Structures are given as structure tokens and as C-alpha cells.
Regions:
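An N-terminally biased module of ancient metal coordination in phosphate/nucleic-acid-related enzymes
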Residues: 1-72, 157-160, 171-179, 183-184, ...
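Extended substrate/RNA-proximal surfaces in nucleic-acid metabolism proteins
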Residues: 51-210, 263, 267-269
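C-terminal regions of proteins
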Residues: 257-258
Length: 276
């Protein structure tokens, strides 16, 4: 079992737990190296760092940046960043503004599908008013009885081809990697097994990521199967990329894995945490 977890979310994006509570949970689960990586948001880092330092947990400042690559939405995790760097702060500010606009359009789409009041409902679940996400809509729809859990809401209403799906232009891959680099961090392709990419597009993505100076692939993560650990480990080796590991924890009952419950990386991979 790894004592490292480099992907998690708090109430400052779409997680359920406050940064301080999340950090304490990491400690209680035996994590010794922990990163908070809220979606497009840095405001929870100071609180999480303070608790980690008080408990003897090494803290890594992180973020998960939303990216549009071709027709796919990707997530790029930045680790060991300087949260005060003006470049990444300004870039994330633009993304958050876009999130607000997207939330309004999602609500309009759901209203057309006969589900009213979803924007106000989602906002009630969002502790950060600048970051109303699909997860907040999903929690409200579960409350209203439209599905048993948030995963079912996504499949029924919020993914491509469903009533509440809204296309959106996020940051480019180059922008995300550049912001992370300028902030002194390392960039990681998050949960690559989740993306619907053909083999050709997968190769193109990895090559482009390397050309831009990308550092690592998240090989071990909550949504990956054991087979995917091996598959993405091989890709990391082939492209000379390091390997990261993170639960992608959002909260109890909403995550594939709890914090601190990650298996070891496949043999022969270079851990990204060797970089900081």
C-alpha cells in the first residue's frame, strides 16, 4: 500500500470535505505525502497545508486544470506549484469564469428536459460560488430523486449526448502545461484511462504532452483497473514519463478509492514525487 496520495478534492471545488478535514483524513489513513488538487482552484491549499504540517504530513500544493484537447475534455494535474504565481492564478481565474457560464447553460438544458430549479439547487451544494460543477448538479438531482447516486446522474443526464451535457472550451493543453511550469510545478495527465481516445489519438496526446514538457502520467488512480495500471505504466516507460498515484478522492460514497488506499506503482516506474 502506498503512503502517497497526489490527487484529491475539497469543498473548494467538487469535493465534500473541507480542506482541513481532508488533510486530517489523509493523516488518519497513513498518508505521508499528500496533495490537494482542486479543480481550477487554489484557495483551499493554505488550510490543507497548515493541518498537514501540524500532523507531520508532507504537503504538496496542487491543482487539476480543465483542458480541451480536440473534442475531448482532459484533466492535467499540476503538482508542487507555487500558488501565488501570477500566471497560474490568472489562467485559473479565466477558467472559473467559464465554469459559471457553463453552469447556467447546464441548468437551461435541464430545464428544457423538464427538471427545474437545478442552478439554485447546484449552488446550494457548492461551497465555492465560483466553482459550480457537474458534481453539484448531480448531488441535487440525487436529492430530487432522479437517480440513486451521482454516478447514475452523470450517465443519465450529464455526459455527452445526454440532456444536461454542455460543450465548453477549457484551457489548451499548452496553456495548462505552461502555467504549471511557470509556477515551478510538474504536470501530470490525470486518470488517462477515463478518456475515450482511439489508439492513434492516445499516441498523439502522449507525444504532444512530452513535446510540451509534460512530466508524468497518473498510472495508479481510483478509476483505473489493475489492467490499466499495467497499460499506462507501459506507456509511461515508452514515452519516458514518470508515474503518479492519486485516489481522486471526492468524499465518502462518491469515490472509487479512499485516501491512502492506493496500491504500489507497477515495478520499474519512476515516481513523480522523486521530482520534488
Amino acid at each position: 500500500m502506498l503512503d502517497v496520495d497526489l490527487h484529491s478534492h475539497s469543498t473548494h471545488s467538487d469535493g465534500i470535505l473541507l480542506p482541513a478535514v481532508l488533510a486530517r483524513r489523509a493523516f488518519e489513513q497513513g498518508v505521508k505525502l499528500f496533495a490537494l488538487t482542486d479543480h481550477d482552484e487554489l484557495s483551499g491549499l493554505a488550510e490543507a497545508r497548515e493541518v498537514c504540517e501540524s500532523l507531520g504530513v508532507r504537503f504538496v500544493s496542487g491543482v487539476e486544470i480543465s483542458v480541451t484537447w480536440g473534442e475531448e475534455t482532459l484533466h492535467i494535474v499540476g503538482l508542487n506549484i507555487n500558488p501565488q504565481h501570477p500566471s497560474i492564478a490568472a489562467g485559473l481565474g479565466l477558467i472559473r469564469k467559464g465554469r459559471g457560464e457553463r453552469a447556467k447553460r447546464i441548468a437551461e438544458q435541464l430545464d428544457k428536459a423538464g427538471i427545474e430549479g437545478t442552478l439554485a439547487g447546484a449552488q446550494r451544494y457548492a461551497s465555492n460560488p465560483q466553482l459550480v460543477s457537474r458534481a453539484h448538479f448531480a448531488r441535487f438531482l440525487v436529492e430530487r430523486g432522479h437517480a440513486k447516486n451521482t454516478q447514475a446522474v452523470f450517465k443519465r443526464y450529464l455526459i455527452a449526448g445526454k440532456p444536461g451535457f454542455v460543450e465548453h472550451q477549457w484551457a489548451s493543453l499548452a496553456q495548462a502545461v505552461n502555467w504549471i511550469d511557470e509556477a515551478g510545478g510538474v504536470s501530470v495527465i490525470a486518470h488517462p484511462g477515463r478518456y475515450q481516445l482511439s489508439p492513434t489519438l492516445r499516441e498523439r496526446l502522449l507525444a504532444e504532452f512530452c513535446d510540451l514538457g509534460g512530466t508524468a502520467i497518473e498510472v495508479v488512480t481510483g478509476s483505473h483497473t489493475v489492467d490499466q495500471y499495467a497499460i499506462w505504466g507501459r506507456h509511461a516507460k515508452r514515452f519516458g514519463l514518470k508515474a503518479s498515484a492519486g485516489s481522486d478522492f471526492h468524499g465518502p460514497q462518491e469515490s472509487y478509492l479512499d485516501i491512502g488506499r492506493l496500491p504500489n506503482l507497477p515495478e520499474g516506474l519512476i515516481p513523480v514525487w522523486n521530482s520534488f
